[in-house]
Amino acid sequence: KRVNKSWRQDLRFFCGGRLIFGPDVRSVFVILLLIIGPVAVFCIFVGKHLCKDYSNGLAMVVVVVIHTFIVLVLLLRTSGRDPGIIPRNAHPPEPEEDVNLPSNWSGSVTPKLKLPRTKDILVNGVTVKIKYCDTCMLYRPPRCSHCSICNNCVERFDHHCPWVGQCIGRRNYPFFFMFILSTTLLCFLVFVLCVLRVKKLMEENSPHTVWKALERTPASTFLMAYVFLATWFVGGLTVFHTYLIGTNQVS
């Protein structure tokens, strides 16, 4: 019996449970469009000119395509992987032995014991306070949190990412970081190659202003503006998570 049978069915399972997506899996298709669409525009309207203008132009386009493929694989590994879901209990845990019975207990009816909201455990010689989750009926390990969207407790929970439609936790955080890092590099690569295309147009009709060159290649103009804005978002996210990794924190 698979462990995922005990998980909330708000999740989406594919390939016999090998792929696990969050309830907002549709947002993944939006991300796919935002990645594949601009790359397709680049290959069709900019890449063909790079192949003509530069001896290694074809290699430039191939690098972009391969890098895009890597980004998509990392996206799938981030969005379709178990982030570290802790299977919920079917029943509340047994109360500790030192839980006191009510003073007015007659003995004829078993009292309803209320579990403490927190308890202390020892981790590497340090006392850590852990909390009880009423939904999953378990005491959450350190750095574990309950996601209100997926409705599961996730180990080393960082955040629920609406863009990839999945929680980011212990098991998929490395893929998430590599995804945003590789996406940042892809944006930078496309921007530089579009600049090369504009530069070539300026050289062909010298003296040619930048604005005239941009008018002659609207695809490059669009892509440079698009990846510039995208880099502010995903690049800033990459820098932020690099800092978190360096300081051993979660967001």
Regions from the PLM with identified roles:
Residues 137-143, 169, 176:
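Loop-to-transmembrane boundary segments
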Residues 62-63, 118-121, 134, 148, ...:
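Eukaryotic intrinsically disordered and solvent-exposed regulatory patches
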Residues 127-130, 141, 155:
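Processing junctions and N-termini across compartments
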Residues 137, 151-154, 165-168:
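Cys/His-coordinated zinc-binding microdomains
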Residues 111-120, 128-134:
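Short Cys/His-rich Zn2+-coordinating modules
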Residues 142-145, 156-159, 163, 170:
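Short, non-ligating residues that shape and space the ligands of small metal-coordination modules
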Residues 133-136, 147-150, 161:
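Short cysteine-rich clusters marking metal-coordination/redox-active sites
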